[in-house]
């Protein structure tokens, strides 16, 4: 099956698995999805991720994270830049999500970065999604 927007598909799979309190979600892998999973892990939104080698396409297994009383760590995921409407920001326009409580994931010339990292490096890019 051909997916028009693979990043939106990834976010939707994570959101659906999170809403049903699943521990694990499998997603078709790509380099960009692996980079987004790395950022989610670094920022503490997921426990871990693993690339599963299989034919014809590798899978990305994401282990979701919940608090000790069972509350979701990821309360929201939103796709910003879409194939039909790309959203780019300059270095001084990098957004803050919920006043700094969430993160914006950006695709920059230096790879996939969070909004904080992009501000520190002084670069803008394409706003892929918000996570809070």
Curated annotation (Swiss-Prot):
The keyword Hydrolase does not apply. Keywords: Ribonucleoprotein, Ribosomal protein, RNA-binding, rRNA-binding. It comes from the Bacteria. Belongs to the universal ribosomal protein uS8 family. GO terms for cellular component: ribonucleoprotein complex; ribosome. SUPFAM superfamilies: Ribosomal protein S8 (SSF56047). This is Small ribosomal subunit protein uS8. GO terms for biological process: translation. One of the primary rRNA binding proteins, it binds directly to 16S rRNA central domain where it helps coordinate assembly of the platform of the 30S subunit. The lineage of its organism: Bacteria, Bacillati, Bacillota, Clostridia, Halanaerobiales. The keyword rRNA-binding applies. One of its GO terms (molecular function) is rRNA binding. PANTHER family: 40S RIBOSOMAL PROTEIN S15A. Part of the 30S ribosomal subunit. Contacts proteins S5 and S12.
């Amino acid at each position: 099956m051909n997916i028009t927007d693979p990043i939106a598909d990834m976010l939707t799979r994570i959101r659906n698995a999170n809403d049903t309190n699943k521990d694990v979600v499998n997603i078709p892998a790509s380099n960009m999805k692996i980079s987004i999973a790395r950022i989610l892990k670094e920022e503490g939104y997921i426990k871990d991720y693993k690339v599963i080698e299989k034919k014809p396409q590798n899978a990305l297994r994401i282990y979701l994270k919940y608090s000790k009383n069972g509350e979701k760590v990821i309360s929201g995921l939103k796709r910003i830049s879409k194939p039909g409407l790309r959203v780019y920001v300059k270095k001084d326009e990098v957004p803050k999500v919920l006043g700094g409580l969430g993160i914006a994931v950006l695709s920059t010339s230096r790879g996939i970065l969070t909004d904080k990292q992009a501000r520190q490096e002084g670069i803008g890019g394409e706003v892929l999604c918000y996570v809070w």
